[in-house]
Design a protein with these regions (language model features):
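N-terminal small/hydrophobic-rich alpha-helical segments that act as secretion/targeting modules
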Residues: 261-262
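C-terminal/peripheral segments of proteins
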Residues: 1-257, 266, 270-477
Length: 477
């Protein structure tokens, strides 16, 4: 989109996080004939529409892509000889995308900014916006589907469910909050809604709330903040979420006969409580937790895996902590995965697995988080080059602090796309970070500019410096 996605115009400043709402439905398509040219609908049958999309290949023949369309959307998967799945997704519907986001650049206050956001055709996002008068607001932006009938989100919809999309909800139905009583707003890919609003938006995999909680608590800690104070919140790599898991590892090792469990606990005994690049304890505790949760999840989903066989796909369950931690505290026998004789054996088995992985590379005390969390940030075309030349299109392989469940969210290939701190009207005091820099041209003198500051967390100015080049677009006539 040729617009300023996030930024400040002197009157309002705004930014986004992903909404993780449920913006699609799968429909079961029951074929009415063997050649799959007709499918069943309420009250009869309907003909399948087939459209050809041609992909032009340089130096080769065009490739035809046939798109099979139903009344609900395109066929995207096959269940068996008689049934397929069709996808109905907001992004594929008329009116879903437009250039309305560009109007935020000329908004003069909070109300104008929220009004502009209501007309923006973008993927659904959490918008946080503030104006120079001190007002702040949050709104779930984008077009929201108006569902009717029985639209159960946990399984593919059948014709009998009569789930239909009647178009778009009016913008007044979008969840919104302006001028909160406590004067703060926060969002970090977490669930922001409850009750009827949550039922309207749905759940497509909200992030664990640990990161959002640290941000909220930091914002509540002081009445006023400078730009550097707010940058410090974004750079917070405290591992508060894992503190109880560190204690669980120590407690379990103290009463266990597992040599590997004791070795992990000994190597992680000094707990600095941060996802710092030089921390071995953080890496050990994190890995053990994930191994424990993996065993619990596999056990709970074993019946589904047995029933589906090769069709089973392990779901991504970012809220699994809310299941796993109570199980570890209560240790109910009827929910213990069958391959283990006790919960203690499960915990020891997870330790054996992690001990084997980490010790294979050397002493546990040397297996730092930075060794695992090393930047792998490359130009999209890097994968097309021979390995020996790939480095020309990649940023340095820096050991990175931070992780997913804390404000300084960053991993080898994922993280906050930028950090921004700005008060509208005071852009000269603002701060900006962008991993990889703003230039996508590897031969540009600005290739990678600012990347080192992002790695180190050093403040860099929000406003650009003096212009050094000018690109002029002039029509021929």
């Amino acid at each position: 989109i040729p617009a300023v996605i996030v930024g400040s115009n002197g009157h309002v400043a705004w930014g986004f996080t992903n909404s993780y709402g449920d913006w699609l439905d799968f429909y079961r398509v029951d074929w009415a004939n063997k050649d799959r040219s007709r499918y069943r609908v309420a009250g009869g049958q309907q003909a399948l529409r087939v459209a050809s999309e041609w992909i032009r290949v340089k130096g080769g023949a065009p490739v035809e892509l046939k798109v099979r369309e139903t009344r609900w959307g395109p066929i995207t998967a096959e269940l068996d000889d008689k049934t397929s799945l069709a996808l109905r997704w907001t992004a594929q519907l008329p009116g879903a995308l437009n250039f309305g986001l560009s109007d935020l650049a000329v908004a003069g206050n909070l109300d104008e900014g929220l009004a502009a956001a209501d007309l923006a055709g973008i993927p659904a996002q959490n918008l946080v916006i503030g104006d120079s008068g001190g007002r702040i607001g949050w709104r779930l932006t984008a077009q929201l589907p108006d569902r009717a009938g029985t639209c159960e989100p946990t399984s593919p919809l059948a014709v009998a469910d009569n789930c239909r999309w009647r178009g778009w909800l009016p913008p007044t139905e979008n969840p919104s909050l302006a001028d909160p009583a406590d004067g703060i707003l926060w969002t970090a890919n977490n669930r922001t809604l409850d009750g009827d609003a949550l039922r309207l938006v749905g759940d497509a995999g909200y992030a664990n709330g640990a990161r959002a909680r640290q941000i909220r608590d930091a914002l509540r800690a002081k009445p006023k903040f400078t730009e550097k104070d707010l940058l410090a919140i974004q750079l917070d790599d405290r591992a508060l979420f894992l503190t109880r898991w560190h204690q669980a590892l120590q407690d379990e090792a103290a009463r266990s006969g597992s040599v590997e469990l004791k070795a992990l606990a000994d190597a992680a005994r000094t707990w600095d409580g941060r996802a710092s690049a030089d921390s071995a304890s953080y890496r050990i505790v994190r890995a053990w937790r994930l191994a424990v949760i993996e065993r619990i999840q596999n056990g709970l989903l074993a019946p589904a895996q047995a029933a589906l066989g090769q069709r089973f796909v392990m779901p991504d369950l970012p809220q699994m902590e809310a299941v796993a931690w109570p199980l570890l505290q209560q240790r109910p026998a009827h929910l213990l995965p069958r391959r283990f004789e006790s919960w203690e054996q499960l915990l020891a088995d997870a330790a054996t697995d992690i001990h084997g992985q980490l010790s294979a590379a050397g002493p546990l005390s040397d297996r730092t988080w930075g060794e695992r969390n090393t930047a792998s940030i490359c130009h999209p075309l890097a994968g097309a080059l021979p390995r020996v030349a790939r480095g020309w299109l990649c940023m340095p392989a820096d050991p990175l602090p931070g992780d997913g469940n804390m404000p300084r969210v960053q991993s080898p290939g994922f993280g906050a796309s930028q950090r921004m701190v700005v008060s509208p009207g005071r852009e000269a005091d603002g701060i900006i970070h962008m991993p990889g820099g703003q230039s996508g041209h590897p031969f540009s003198p600005f290739w990678g500019a600012g990347h080192a500051a992002w790695v180190q967390g050093e403040p860099t100015p929000f406003l650009p410096g003096d212009a050094q080049y000018r690109l002029r677009l002039a029509p021929e006539t």
